[in-house]
């Protein structure tokens, strides 16, 4: 298998780790990042010598709270410009439901699949190879090919959910929102603990 990685932050680096010889995998890996210090290959090399392209770039919030997809759009435009082969592009950035379909319509020559990440920055490598499920959203044929990639790498140890763009994107948002809700809940409970004089560490031990 030939794996291309665009965006070598902690998410892209986790993909590189998971498919590297360090984990017993023999995939051929090429890496591009806009930061020359992180880039190993050119974007042309990564795009045209890969079966699967993992795109992991930022989607920061705009001042009004909406998601800014400019970086994703820019990279997809670059891929579209240099593409000579037809790799599957796996989008891993957080996006509102409907975003992947819009990009697929804007760049019909690309094979786009939404494959959200569920990683924490400090343990991203471990999280990637031990995650509870893989989510794949998009065209059925492309999704099946991505499933084959993950089965090739992980066997049947990790469940794979195959669905459409919108459902995959919603799953990612649900996960993010639920995590935020848990953090908010625990922060509130800590305030209650401090106010009533409870032993917070013991409360945590008993709760978890």
Where are these regions (language model features)?
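Gly/Ser/Thr-rich loops at beta-strand to alpha-helix junctions
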Residues: 11, 94-98, 179
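Rossmann-like NAD(P)(H) cofactor-binding subdomain of soluble oxidoreductases
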Residues: 52, 60-124
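Short conserved AdoMet
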Residues: 24, 48, 83-84, 155
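Structural motif
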Residues: 33-34, 54-56, 92-94, 135, 137-140
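NAD(P)+-binding Rossmann beta1-loop-alpha1 motif at the extreme N-terminus of oxidoreductases
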Residues: 1-48, 52
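Short, charged/polar "capping" segments at the starts of alpha-helices
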Residues: 37-41, 97-101, 141-145
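Internal alpha-helical scaffold of NAD(P)-dependent oxidoreductase catalytic cores
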Residues: 25, 104-113, 124-208
